[in-house]
Amino acid sequence: MANIKAKKYYSYAKINLFLHILNKRPDGYHNLQTWFTFLDLKDQLTFSFNNSREINISSNISIAAKQDNLVYKAIKKFQQSYRVQDIGVDIEIKKNIPMGAGLGGGSSNAATTLIALRDYYLPQLSNEEMIPLAAKLGADVPIFVYGKSAWAEGIGEILYHKDFSPQYALLIKPDIHISTKEFFTSEDLIKSSVLISKDLGFDKSIMHNDFENVFYAKYPEFSQYLKELDSDFRMTGTGSCFYLLSADKNKLEQLARKINKPLDKWLVKTLNYVY
C-alpha cells in the first residue's frame, strides 16, 4: 500500500452534564445514565499511513508505553475485529486536553484513531457500526465515535442523540490525581436503581454527578472553595475537572479573574457535533 499524505484529525473533549451510577455488572463495569456534550477544547492527531508495517506513536507530552496506550489498543482492536493486517502508520498526537481530568482525552484519541483507520481501510463502515468495538476499549470511547451530544445508558454505549443548548463553560482543574477505581468502590458513592427519564430537559435539581459526594468527602477544603466561587460548579466524569456553564461569557471571564488559587482553567464553548 503506497504512502499517503499525512492527514490531520481533531479529537475533542467532553463533559458529563450529569452522571448517575446504577449498579455494578458481572463484567466489572457499572450501568449508568449520563448526558454527554462536547467542548471546543481539542487535541490534534496526525496520521501518516505507510508500508512499514510498524506502528509509531509520538506526542508533545509524555505518553504511556505502547501496550498501555489507548491509541495503540484501538489499532490492535481494529485489526482483530476487521481482519486488517500489516498496518503501518506514524501517529503524532498534539495534546491540549488535560489528562486525568474527566474530559475523556484518552478515550477521544482512541475514537479518533478508529475513525482514521476506518477512513483509510474501510470507508464503507459507518461510525455507528464501530460503537460495539469502541465499547471494548472503554466506557467513554463510544460517545466520541458517535460524535453527537447524546444521552447514554448501559456502560455508555447505548446512545440516544440529545442536543444541549450551546453554552460557554469555565473549566477549572486542581492538581489532584483521581483514582477511578477508588471512586467506584468508595463508601461515599451512593448508587441508585431509580432511572431518570431521557425525555427530560436539563434539570439541575435531579441531574448531578454521583461522584461529587466522593470528591467532596476526600477533598473538603477544595470543595468548600469551589462552592464559595459558585455553587453551580459540576464535576465531569470522575474528575478532577469541574465546569460552570453559562450563556454569559462575560460572567465566566469575571469569575475566572477571581480565582486566586493555582488552578488550571479554560474558557470554552459546548458543541453538539464534532463530525
From Swiss-Prot:
Catalytic activity field: 4-CDP-2-C-methyl-D-erythritol + ATP = 4-CDP-2-C-methyl-D-erythritol 2-phosphate + ADP + H(+)
Pathway annotation: Isoprenoid biosynthesis; isopentenyl diphosphate biosynthesis via DXP pathway; isopentenyl diphosphate from 1-deoxy-D-xylulose 5-phosphate: step 3/6
Stored InterPro entries: GHMP_kinase_C_dom, GHMP_kinase_C_sf, GHMP_kinase_N_dom, IspE, Ribosomal_Su5_D2-typ_SF, Ribsml_uS5_D2-typ_fold_subgr
Keywords: ATP-binding, Isoprene biosynthesis, Kinase, Nucleotide-binding, Transferase
HAMAP family listed in its UniProt record: IspE (MF_00061)
Function: Catalyzes the phosphorylation of the position 2 hydroxy group of 4-diphosphocytidyl-2C-methyl-D-erythritol.
Disulfide bonds listed in the record: none
Protein's name according to its UniProt entry: 4-diphosphocytidyl-2-C-methyl-D-erythritol kinase
GO molecular function, one term: ATP binding
Residues holding ATP: P98, M99, G100, A101, G102, L103, G104, G105, G106, S107, S108
Gene3D superfamilies: 3.30.230.10, GHMP kinase, C-terminal domain
Signal peptide start and end residues: none
Similarity field: Belongs to the GHMP kinase family. IspE subfamily.
Residues at the catalytic site: K14, D140
Biological process according to GO: isopentenyl diphosphate biosynthetic process, methylerythritol 4-phosphate pathway; terpenoid biosynthetic process
Enzymatic class: transferase
Xref: Pfam families: GHMP_kinases_C, GHMP_kinases_N
